Amino acid sequence: VGTSGKIVAIASHLPGRVLSNDDLAALYPSWPADKILDKTGVQTRHIAAPGETAVDLAQAAAEALFAQGRVAPSDIDYLLFCTQAPDHILPTSACILQRRLGLRTDIGALDFNLGCSGFVYGLSMAQALIASGQARRVLLLTADTYSKLIHPMDRGVRSLFGDGAAATLIEAVETDTPALGPFVFGTDGSGAENLIVPAGGFRQPRTAQTAVVTEDASGNLRSADHLYMNGAAIMTFTLGAVPAAIDKLLARAGATLDDYDAVVLHQASAFILDRLRRKLAVPEDRFVVALRDWGNTVSSTIPMALEPLVRDGRPRRVLLVGFGVGYSWAAAQALL
């Protein structure tokens, strides 16, 4: 018997403004609403208001979690915040969230900058903190506002991404079998340029030059200040890295895909998910697809897809895989 972290509660939050396929079709005459749904699997996406940040969304998700009554703010002894949209270069947004949420001051709190793999990385850190006795209850917040990085006429990415946040409570349990893990990680910085906001950091500060908008071969508009995604390269990376990571995880867990009640992958797009499901030969009833109403919410797609499974309280063995920007990826087993 040992101490393990376990996912015991999840709550998500979506900003109020909704961007529908009809809204997008009005901007892109060659893309009717049904074509956008067919291509992306997304019907609507939620968009943060001007002045509404990832920190605001994360706060709302955490407050929704506390409202479930399972845990109080004073019970949290470590805060992990995954975002690529901090309020400030410094201080760390997790410190701002500690104060806003009324958490104790004798806790650990930090941000980490990952995208689509971030939730699984966050689970691994929570598990390490709990198994080593450094924390009993870890609050993992994931939030992003990619809408603020996307040029309105870059239809490829604008149709896919939505803003949102999730709050996940990982709690210590005494158990024979760890409720989190094993984990498999992957990193390949040679793909960094395929999903990137080139300007705005210290390598390439924003200037009048970086704000110059150009049109690509597909008619999408963007500048160096905006998000760029090489969809074809991302697809190739995903179809190679994800099945390989799953094979590695299954070997470590001594399991087959049939042993899992649910397979929850990062909800990149309906097209990528369908390709992966077929490649992995997972039946549709055990393969979670949850992006129609909110799109690709980056680090929050997996917890948002898990939320109904955690809420219904039925014990399940689930396989989680996050993958994307970096390139960064991670796979994990979780017992709910």
Question: Predicted segments — roles?
Answer:
Residues 29-38, 88-102, 140-146, 209-219, ...:
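Acidic-glycine-rich active-site phosphate/pyrophosphate-binding loop
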Residues 7-9, 36, 65, 79, ...:
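Buried hydrophobic positions in well-ordered alpha/beta secondary-structure cores of metabolic enzymes
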Residues 70-105:
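Anion-binding (especially nucleotide phosphate/pyrophosphate-binding) glycine-rich loop
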Residues 131-165:
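Flexible, glycine-rich active-site loops centered on histidine and acidic residues
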Residues 18-19, 90-92, 150-154, 329-333:
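Short acidic, glycine/serine/threonine-rich loops at helix termini
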Residues 55, 59-62, 85-86, 99, ...:
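Claisen-condensing/thiolase-fold acyl-transfer catalytic domains that form or cleave C-C bonds
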Residues 11, 82, 113, 138-144, ...:
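Short beta-strand segments
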Residues 1-50, 154-236, 240, 244, ...:
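Condensing-enzyme catalytic core mediating Claisen C-C bond formation in acyl metabolism
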